[in-house]
From Swiss-Prot:
Chief location category: cytoplasm
Gene coding for it: murC
Top-level division of the source organism's lineage: Bacteria
Upper classification of the organism: Bacteria, Pseudomonadati, Pseudomonadota, Alphaproteobacteria, Acetobacterales
BP-aspect Gene Ontology terms: cell division; cell wall organization; peptidoglycan biosynthetic process; regulation of cell shape
Ligase among keywords: yes
InterPro entries: Mur-like_cat_sf, Mur_ligase_C, Mur_ligase_C_dom_sf, Mur_ligase_cen, Mur_ligase_N, MurCDEF_pg_biosynth, UDP-N-AcMur_Ala_ligase_MurC
Source organism: Gluconacetobacter diazotrophicus (strain ATCC 49037 / DSM 5601 / CCUG 37298 / CIP 103539 / LMG 7603 / PAl5)
Cellular location(s): Cytoplasm
PANTHER family with a match to the protein in the record: UDP-N-ACETYLMURAMATE--L-ALANINE LIGASE (PTHR43445:SF3), UDP-N-ACETYLMURAMATE--L-ALANINE LIGASE-RELATED (PTHR43445)
A Pfam family of this chain: Mur_ligase
Protein name (database record): UDP-N-acetylmuramate--L-alanine ligase
Family recorded in the similarity comment: Belongs to the MurCDEF family.
A GO cellular-component term linked to this record: cytoplasm
Role played: Cell wall formation.
Length: 480
């Protein structure tokens, strides 16, 4: 990989423990740059960066800058952060996370994956395809890729695959040769204001590709399909289950471990159609078949053969917190999933049904008051595949509470719309007892949310085991 053209000194990341920030910091460190950072609290990303040799301070203080010559911030960092204030006072350049990512992307041919849902998994699948094709890509993802144990991969090849964050409009800065749009549902309207403004930004995201690049669009999603006539000057490849898709899935067979499917590949320019597959994807849900189709579309356009595509999918180990099994006890399976938008929640619960669950118990921690308020109706109708819904308090993520937008409002909204079994979670400490009283062998307990619920999902199997066999639990305590 080429380096940035000038010596830029020590790079300081404010909020280095964030998933996006940590990935960029790790790649810069692997490129040989001096990298350091700070965050408000310890987390797994901070520990991983320290293990890689990057100094991370806990807490924000002007003294943390040290000899830094560049400061990188994310949208979560306020302008009055003491490190940012000190950097500006010392005339140190303050760079947004997306700007730094864009500079890294200029050093490679880049694939940028955007969309409301499925970005992280699709980014990981495309990375797996390029890696299987021995293109040795660099990867910066928005989630932990199980095969890497991190959200980054430093490759020596010409290609880079990145997840593009649309939440603050920063994805418009990213210079890519290939763009992917998985879907487009109303989200982050606190930034965009209207769905129309968000859609216009996606149009620009795709329009930024050069004439020799191409866009990969999910035609199954109506808002994405509506983009096609507006982007007629660009090369477009569509994918999905629709008969109109250029890369179309057929004969999808699902089981408890994943899906098998065939693909019809249509080349509109040459008026040719061929069949490919079957492909085996060790992931549950039709939404993940769609994600795989996006990776196939990229692979086909890059002349990667079908055998390589099959190999990439067969060995795919998934992404952390995407339908991740944290344990099984007494025949009850506990799942941890990042899903926090109604569309994601519905897809995950449907996947649990497809996996053969006797019944599905959803434990939902709404993420942000503003999201719950904006999408309240959708939240109240997205959980029909769960036999029982346990609703936790809203994870604020730094937001102030909004009157009337809370756990109890969601519980009432679900009940009013006909859900027969919805209960509030009084406190996380009561979760295991509640699940123990409800769950039966063969059930899936699906913990959903982008906040602290992941910690509950990790602890729940052990807590259930202790409740199922209290004598063994007491014996273990005595031995300790």
């Amino acid at each position: 990989m080429r380096a940035l053209p000038l010596s830029i000194g020590t790079i300081h990341f404010v909020g280095i423990g964030g998933i996006g920030m940590s990935g960029i910091a790790e790649v810069l460190h692997m490129l040989g740059y001096a990298v350091q950072g700070s965050d408000i609290a310890e987390n797994a990303n901070v520990q991983r960066l320290r293990a890689a040799g990057i100094t991370v301070a806990i807490g924000h203080d002007a003294a943390n800058l040290g000899a830094a010559q560049v400061v990188v911030t994310s949208t979560a960092v306020r302008r009055d952060n003491p490190e940012v204030v000190a950097a500006r006072a010392r005339l140190i350049p303050v760079v947004r996370r997306a700007e730094m990512l864009a500079e890294l992307m200029r050093l490679r041919w880049a694939v940028a994956v955007g969309g409301t849902h499925g970005k992280t998994t699709t980014t990981s699948l495309i990375a797996a395809v390029l890696e299987a094709a021995r293109l040795d890509p660099t990867v910066i993802n928005g989630g932990i890729i199980e095969a890497y144990g991190t959200n980054t991969r430093m490759g020596s090849g010409d290609w880079m695959v990145v997840e593009a964050d649309e939440s603050d409009g920063s994805f418009l800065r990213l210079p890519s040769v290939i763009t992917v749009v998985t879907n487009m549902d109303p989200e982050h309207l606190d930034h965009w204001g209207t769905a129309e403004a968000m859609q216009a930004a996606y149009d620009q995201f795709v329009s930024n590709i050069p004439f020799y690049g191409f866009a990969v669009l999910c035609i199954d999603h109506p808002a994405v399909q509506q983009m096609i006539p507006r982007l007629s000057d660009h090369r477009i490849v569509t994918y999905g289950f629709s008969p109109q898709a250029d890369i179309r899935a057929e004969k999808v067979i699902t089981d408890k471990l994943g899906a098998t499917f065939e693909v019809v590949v249509t080349n509109r320019n040459r008026n040719r159609t061929r069949r490919a597959g079957p492909f085996r994807l060790p992931m549950l849900g039709h939404h993940n078949v769609q994600n795989a189709l996006a990776a196939i579309a990229v692979g086909v356009e890059m002349d990667i053969d079908d055998a390589t595509l099959r190999s990439a999918f067969a060995g795919f180990r998934g992404v952390k917190r995407r339908f991740t099994r944290t344990g099984e006890t007494g025949g009850i399976t506990v799942i941890d999933d990042y899903g926090h938008h109604p569309v994601e929640i519905a897809a995950v619960l449907k996947a649990a049904r497809q996996a053969g669950a006797r019944d599905v118990i959803a434990v939902v921690q709404p993420h942000r008051y503003s999201r719950l308020q904006t999408l309240f109706g959708e939240f109240c109708t997205c959980m029909n595949d769960a036999g029982t819904v346990i609703v936790a308090d809203v994870y604020a993520a730094g937001e102030a509470p909004i009157p009337g937008v809370d756990r109890d409002a969601l519980v009432e909204g679900l009940r009013e719309r006909g859900h027969r079994s919805v209960v509030p979670l009084p406190d996380p400490e009561h979760l295991a007892e509640m699940v123990h009283a409800i769950a039966r062998p063969g059930d899936f307990v699906v913990c959903l949310g982008a906040g602290s619920i992941t910690n509950w999902a990790q602890a729940l199997p052990g807590q259930l085991a202790a409740l199922q066999n209290p004598a063994a639990a007491r014996k273990g305590e005595c031995a300790a």
